[in-house]
UniProtKB/Swiss-Prot annotation:
GO cellular component: membrane
Membrane topology category: Multi-pass membrane protein
Keyword Iron-sulfur found: no
Biological source species: Acremonium sp
Membrane-spanning residues: 64-86, 106-123
Domain of life: Eukaryota
A single MF term (Gene Ontology): isomerase activity
Record keywords: Glycoprotein, Isomerase, Membrane, Signal, Transmembrane, Transmembrane helix, Virulence
Record bears the keyword Transmembrane helix: yes
Pathway: Mycotoxin biosynthesis
The protein, known as: Cyclic ether formation enzyme pydZ
Subcellular location field: Membrane
Gene: pydZ
Length: 124
C-alpha cells in the first residue's frame, strides 16, 4: 500500500469521525453544546434557502441530515465503498457551500471540508 493511499485512508477516517460528530450534535447537545446550538440555529435558514422545494419541517430535515451523516460515516469506513463515499461527500459539501453562499454566511467550514475530501480523492 502506497503512502498516498494511507494518507487518503486517514483523511477518510477523519471525515468519517467528523460526520459521526455531526450526528451526535444533531441529536443531542450533551458533548458539543456550541456546535449543536449552531446547527439548530442555522438549520431553519438552510431549510428555507435550499430545501424549500421539499416542504419538510426543520425537524424532518434534521433527521435527514442525521441519516446522510450516518451513511457518509459508513461509506468512508468501508474499504470497498470509500471511493464512492468520498465523491458522495464532496457533492453534499457542494450543496452546503451553495447554501452558505445563498445565505451570505461564511463558506470557510464547507471549503475546508471540501479541501480535505478533495485531497483524499486526489491522492487515492
Amino acid at each position: 500500500m502506497s503512502s498516498a493511499h494511507v494518507l487518503s485512508d486517514w483523511l477518510s477516517y477523519s471525515i468519517a469521525g467528523f460526520s459521526a460528530l455531526c450526528v451526535q450534535a444533531h441529536l443531542t447537545s450533551r458533548f458539543t453544546p456550541a456546535f449543536s446550538r449552531n446547527l439548530s440555529e442555522k438549520l431553519p435558514e438552510h431549510n428555507r434557502a435550499v430545501f424549500w422545494w421539499a416542504g419538510m419541517s426543520t425537524r424532518a430535515l434534521r433527521y435527514v441530515f442525521v441519516v446522510i451523516n450516518i451513511t457518509i460515516t459508513a461509506l468512508l469506513l468501508s474499504e470497498e465503498l470509500r471511493s464512492f463515499g468520498l465523491k458522495f461527500s464532496l457533492v453534499l459539501l457542494g450543496v452546503g457551500f451553495y447554501s452558505d453562499m445563498k445565505l451570505g454566511e461564511s463558506p470557510v467550514p464547507h471549503m475546508i471540508l471540501c479541501s480535505v475530501v478533495g485531497a483524499a480523492i486526489l491522492v487515492r
